[in-house]
Amino acid sequence: MRTNPTTSPPGASTIEEKSTGRIDQIIGPVLDVTFPPGKLPYIYNALVVQSRDTDDKQINVTCEVQQLLGNNRVRAVAMSATDGLMRGMEVIDTGAPLSVPVGGATLGRIFNVLGEPVDNLGPVDSSATFPIHRSAPAFIELDTKLSIFETGIKVVDLLAPYRRGGKIGLFGGAGVGKTVLIMELINNIAKAHGGVSVFGGVGERTREGNDLYMEMKESGVINEKNIEESKVALVYGQMNEPPGARMRVGLTALTMAEYFRDVNKQDVLLFIDNIFRFVQAGSEVSALLGRMPSAVGYQPTLSTEMGSLQERIASTKKGSITSIQAVYVPADDLTDPAPATTFAHLDATTVLSRGLASKGIYPAVDPLDSTSTMLQPRIVGNEHYETAQRVKETLQRYKELQDIIAILGLDELSEEDRLTVARARKIERFLSQPFFVAEVFTGSPGKYVALAETIRGFQLILSGELDGLPEQAFYLVGNIDEASTKAITLEEENKSQK
């Protein structure tokens, strides 16, 4: 007899142990269920309602236990619409938390919060399943070595490097290249690190999820001909889903990523778009459960909920999960509790700039606004650190001079400032790069640039050795040797035109 139910054990129970209850009350996505004495389910257990509505349509609703109300009653939150449910319907306690399929069979497929495929490609051929509620890795399992996660993208690796097993915040409005940057990272981790990616669409637009899927198929990140060779699994809980689904879809994606890290011992990229929607869904559920709201109307358990997700994203001795999280900042207020709680967990920020995108510089990563805790001499080495600082100083000086240039023109600047501007413009263009996933749109072959090559290139620009080359030669190239080759080509083209 279970008299003191708390959080359930990870293993599923046998059919004999499954107890049944009855729906007592339905308020929107929240159900109150009464069970026989001593048969109460554990907190976080999955409950299933299988019945028929008044039109004789099949109902199949999964819920998650959130509260114990006393008098043999529990309060659960539905993971799908509660249309057609009625008081008195039978509810089955599955005896375990929600479990989702994991492993190689998930690659190239789209799942919902319950781990059910929603891409009309048939069932998933995976015998392995993991519960979505799992403990964070123990301290003894964590990899304490600070190491850089090389992405092959110059601006990221030089100025705001990612930490292996770290968490990165991605800030950017619509149409500045967030999706293309995400797809390039998925492509590069597969090629350079032999890793895979999991994309968690949390509370965002269904259209965007569909566009991402179509673009991934077009760029080859999802291989339609041989689905197992795809590099990414997609988990969607979009804006139209009930708050329970939006609150748990991040955990479903994370659970799939944990399998690749812990069992396959791979480096995994986990994308969460958008982490703010995870908090927002938690706030909605908290209100539905009758909890007293905290600051700005958010749930009182905000920090705990965020921590339980973020602490599972870590680098262990087996493999790593590096997470890139799109962060929506409500009303651009960085002190709002949702983004403020997220910032406490981030190791780096990648800020996309509309100004750079309008100049045609892609990736449109803002070199001055993007930051990383990894950019320290003891971690990246003196050469990398000093090069990055000099690049930032040059770009900052150029930014300060732009007002003067706009009013008086370049001719009014001192010789030293004119040289700084010329080098800054070369640096700005050299920070652009052709992407593999954009080949189908641009016709330019993609480039993966190793960190050592990136540092060498910027050192040559800063030293003045390349002052004679036109700035156009640095635009959309890989390493610095390609810029020199492009300069010769441009010169020959100019001669032939004359």
UniProtKB/Swiss-Prot annotation:
HAMAP family from the UniProt entry: ATP_synth_beta_bact
Keywords: ATP synthesis, ATP-binding, CF(1), Chloroplast, Hydrogen ion transport, Ion transport, Membrane, Nucleotide-binding, Plastid, Thylakoid, Translocase, Transport
Gene name in the database record: atpB
Top enzyme class: translocase
Keyword Ion transport carried by entry: yes
Bilayer topology term: Peripheral membrane protein
NCBIfam families: atpD (TIGR01039)
Domain of life where this protein originates: Eukaryota
Keyword ATP-binding in annotation: yes
InterPro entries tied to this protein: AAA+_ATPase (IPR003593), ATP-synt_VA_C (IPR055190), ATP_synth_F1_bsu (IPR005722), ATPase_a/bsu_AS (IPR020003), ATPase_alpha/beta_chains (IPR050053), ATPase_F1/V1/A1_a/bsu_N (IPR004100), ATPase_F1/V1/A1_a/bsu_N_sf (IPR036121), ATPase_F1/V1/A1_a/bsu_nucl-bd (IPR000194)
Protein's recorded name: ATP synthase subunit beta, chloroplastic
Organism, scientific name: Triticum aestivum (Wheat)
Example GO biological process: proton motive force-driven mitochondrial ATP synthesis
Protein family per UniProt: Belongs to the ATPase alpha/beta chains family.
